[in-house]
């Protein structure tokens, strides 16, 4: 881990807007981008495509070691483009089914260990914006700036509903709310790297904030670090 390279760690629950915010910040700062949650989605997606059972730790660990992925910051609702083995998979890994699979494989210690060094390798000059569930607590505990971005479960369900409806999906908002609550409980209760703010993280509740307001708030904290924004 290159501690000399500046970085911003953004953690928080599903649907809090971490990916969009991280992508916009990476573009603004001109830094590298890491979407930790997408790595688990990518692994779950690849596992299904390769016929690997999502409970098979050894097979998943081997598959994780060969994931060829790039995150390209973009100025849109995703905040990024995700390239897996040369193919863009930004949208196809964002289904609720893949998300559930990602949460399932993320609970496996061997899988988390396999992806840990991969994630740390993203910390290269001129800097890194990393978002996930344990960036500030496990992956980059020495990050100089840590943000824990959250929002109410109801607001996160509303945002996800509007996002899916805009894509023409037939979704039920109450079902999305239930899924988010279940995922929150699973992620916060898991034995390995449970979802929680780092002791030195700045808590940011975006329930009544626009994406632009969230970005500007974090930029203010970046300025306080003396970073060129």
From Swiss-Prot:
Protein name: Cytidylate kinase
GO cellular component, one term: cytosol
InterPro entries for this protein: Cytidylate_kin (IPR003136), Cytidylate_kinase_dom (IPR011994), P-loop_NTPase (IPR027417)
UniProt main location, coarse: cytoplasm
Keywords per UniProt: ATP-binding, Cytoplasm, Kinase, Nucleotide-binding, Transferase
Taxonomic superkingdom: Bacteria
Family of the protein in this entry: Belongs to the cytidylate kinase family. Type 1 subfamily.
Enzyme Commission number(s) from the entry: 2.7.4.25
Catalyzed reactions: CMP + ATP = CDP + ADP; dCMP + ATP = dCDP + ADP
Keyword Transferase in annotation: yes
GO biological process, one term: nucleobase-containing small molecule interconversion
Enzyme class: transferase
GO molecular function, one term: CMP kinase activity
Residues that coordinate or bind ATP: 12-20
Location in or out of the cell: Cytoplasm
Gene: cmk
């Amino acid at each position: 881990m290159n501690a000399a390279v500046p970085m911003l760690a953004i953690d928080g629950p599903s649907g809090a807007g971490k990916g969009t915010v991280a992508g916009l910040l990476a573009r603004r700062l001109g830094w590298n981008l890491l979407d930790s949650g997408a790595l688990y989605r990518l692994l779950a997606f690849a596992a299904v495509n390769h016929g690997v059972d999502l409970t098979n730790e050894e097979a998943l660990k081997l598959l994780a070691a060969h994931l060829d992925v790039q995150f390209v910051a973009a100025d849109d609702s995703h905040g990024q483009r995700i390239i897996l083995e040369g193919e863009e998979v930004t949208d196809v890994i964002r289904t609720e089914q893949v998300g559930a699979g990602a949460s399932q494989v993320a609970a496996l210690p061997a899988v988390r260990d396999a992806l840990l060094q991969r994630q740390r390798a993203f910390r290269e000059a001129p800097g890194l914006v990393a978002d996930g569930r344990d960036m500030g607590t496990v992956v980059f505990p020495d990050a100089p700036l840590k943000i824990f971005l959250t929002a109410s479960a109801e607001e996160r369900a509303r945002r996800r509903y509007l996002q899916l409806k805009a894509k023409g999906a037939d979704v039920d908002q109450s079902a999305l709310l239930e899924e988010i609550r279940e995922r929150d409980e699973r992620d916060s209760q898991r034995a390995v790297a449970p979802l929680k703010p780092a002791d030195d993280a700045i808590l940011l509740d975006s329930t009544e904030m626009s994406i632009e307001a969230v970005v500007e708030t974090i930029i203010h904290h970046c300025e306080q670090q003396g970073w060129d924004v």
